[in-house]
Amino acid sequence: MILIASPFSLAHLEYLHTWHVTIKNIAQQHGLDIKVAIVVSTSHLNNFLPISGALNIECITFPSCGIKEIDLLWARIKLFQHYCAIGARLLWLVSADIRPPVSAWPAIADSLKKGADAVVIPYPSRWNNLIPTVIKEIVVHQKKCLVAVDARHLDTDTQIVGAGMGCIVLTLKALMVRLSIGKQPVKILWPDLHGTAEGIPLEGVEVGWFLNAYAHKLNIRCLGADHIAQHLT
C-alpha cells in the first residue's frame, strides 16, 4: 500500500482531483494499491466525503483552531508513526508556503534515479508536466517522500491547518531533530538555480545544522542514506 497525505481546499477541488487521479493511475499501472490520506478540519469533512470516497481517501480530522503548537506537533508525529506502523511505503506530506520551481522537478527525479532513499518535497503551487515523472520515480522505486515545514506557521496561520492546506505531519524541526540523532551519514542533495542536483555527505548533528540553516533558502531537499528509515521511526 502507498499512503499519500495531501492538502484539501474547497477552492482547489478540481486541481486536487487531477493530482490524485494522476498519482492513482501511475500506481495502478504498476500493480500498487494506493490510499490518499487527507487531513481536514471537522467543518469541511462533510463537504469532502463524496470526493474522498471516489479517490479512496482516508479522512483524518483535527480541530481547526484552539490547538497549541506543541500539541499539534505531537499529534502529527503520532499520525506519522501510525502511517509507518501500517506499512506505508510512501508518505507525501504537504506544505502551503514553500514550493519548488518548475526547473527543480527534473533534479528531483534525477536524485531518485541516483539512489536517494527519501525525498523532501513541498506540494506544488500549480500543475506542471514534470510532476508525473517525479511521481513515477517515487512509486516505481518505492521511495519515501516527506515534506518538512517550519513549525512557526502552525501558530501564526490557523487557517492553513484548519483548511487542510497545511497537512503537516512532520515539521522541519521534527525532521531535523530525528535526523540529527542518527550517526549514519546522510547525503543531502538539492537542485541549484539551473535545476541540477549536487550533494554533500553529512552525519549526526551536521544534518540538523544543515537543515536548520537552509530551512528558508532551499525549495527542495532530497535526503539519501541506507539508514534513513530508522531515523524517522
From Swiss-Prot:
Expression induction: Expressed in the late phase of the viral replicative cycle.
Sorted UniProt keywords: Late protein
Homology family: Belongs to the asfivirus H233R family.
The name this protein goes by in its record: Uncharacterized protein H233R
